[in-house]
């Protein structure tokens, strides 16, 4: 059987094109499984996985937990708000205490960029990065590309624009890496204040006019404004942001072609996207949610296969 070139999923930048292809092919199989009447397989009955979330999460945490249980893994859920971390315990001490319970794999979300990489150098378990600060969110990028592949047949050659708060988004960076590996053309669009200074060095096009960006693309991935990561004001008002960078039905109908709309969630309806767009036939937002379980099953299964060797 083919295997991943890595022992951890720390970021898309550590993967190659073959890794992504293998994850997608494995996800194809698991997507068929989760659409059966009996949605569970016994693949990981001997594997224990700890979900460590040091930042709040609903969708990603539930998706990982469901993926793990669909694979029959034993699951341990950890919340930093109810732990010794609040008492000053270090990350390594926390994880080593959990690993002493014979945990094989750790899924971790952490506010500090590089936390997963740091942890992988100090513990023996396989690490999956479920988001590290504003750095990377690899499984989100994988499920986004997988959803594009499912809808358009292939990612290569497709034009994808990522719209919104690029500066604070781990989803944007992981998507740029993943789409680039697969041969897509990538553009970022948003207010200048929310575009990283050297973003063009990553090989992406940069646009501040939303209409031009949407007329260029095949797919628009809409990002929310991450107010919780902002300590200053990056634009005059939410109303002005919506006027310049919000997508509504009238704007979509004015384009020179029909495009696909995506969103990693959570959606701020009426800000970056209106309800009639989010719920339209051009939207594949719910497909992304469903595909997230299959992709995470694939990643967990492939990494667990390396543990068992």
State each model region's role.
Residues 258-259, 264-309:
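Adenosine-phosphate binding glycine-rich loop
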Residues 1-66:
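Positively charged, low-complexity intrinsically disordered leader regions
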Residues 199-276:
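Rossmann-like adenosine-cofactor binding region
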Residues 54-66, 150-224, 228:
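Glycine-rich phosphate/diphosphate-binding loop of Rossmann-like nucleotide-binding domains
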Residues 38-146, 269:
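Phosphate/diphosphate ligand-binding glycine-rich loop within oxidoreductases
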Residues 44-49, 156-160, 258:
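Phosphate-coordination loops involved in phosphoryl transfer and adenosine-cofactor binding
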Residues 125, 183-185, 254-260:
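A short helix->loop->beta-strand "cap" motif at the edges of active sites that frequently abuts
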């Amino acid at each position: 059987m083919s295997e991943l070139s890595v022992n951890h999923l720390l970021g898309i930048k550590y993967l190659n094109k073959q890794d992504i292809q293998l994850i997608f092919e494995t996800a194809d199989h698991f997507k068929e499984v989760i659409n059966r009447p009996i949605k569970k397989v016994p693949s990981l009955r001997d594997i224990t996985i700890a979900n460590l979330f040091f930042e709040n999460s609903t969708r990603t945490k539930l998706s990982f937990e469901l993926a793990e249980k669909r694979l029959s893994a034993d699951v341990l859920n950890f919340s930093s708000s109810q732990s010794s971390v609040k008492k000053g315990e270090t990350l390594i001490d926390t994880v080593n205490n959990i690993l002493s319970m014979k945990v094989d794999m750790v899924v971790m979300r952490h506010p500090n960029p590089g936390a997963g990489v740091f942890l992988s150098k100090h513990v023996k378990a396989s690490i999956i990065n479920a988001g590290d600060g504003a750095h990377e969110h690899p499984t989100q990028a994988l499920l986004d590309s997988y959803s594009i592949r499912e809808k358009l047949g292939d990612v290569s050659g497709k034009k994808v624009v990522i719209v919104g708060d690029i500066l604070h988004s781990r989803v944007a960076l992981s998507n740029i890496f993943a789409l680039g590996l697969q041969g897509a053309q990538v553009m970022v669009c948003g207010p200048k204040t929310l575009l990283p200074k050297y973003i063009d060095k990553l090989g992406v096009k940069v646009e501040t006019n939303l209409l031009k960006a949407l007329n260029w693309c095949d797919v628009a991935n809409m990002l929310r404004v991450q107010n919780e990561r902002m300590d200053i004001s990056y634009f005059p008002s939410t109303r002005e942001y919506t006027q310049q960078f919000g997508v509504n039905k009238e704007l979509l109908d004015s384009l020179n072609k029909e495009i696909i709309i995506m969103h990693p969630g959570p959606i701020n309806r009426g800000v970056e996207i209106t309800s009639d767009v989010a719920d339209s036939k051009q939207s594949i937002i719910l497909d992304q949610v469903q595909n997230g379980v299959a992709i995470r099953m694939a990643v967990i299964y492939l990494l667990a296969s390396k543990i068992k060797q």
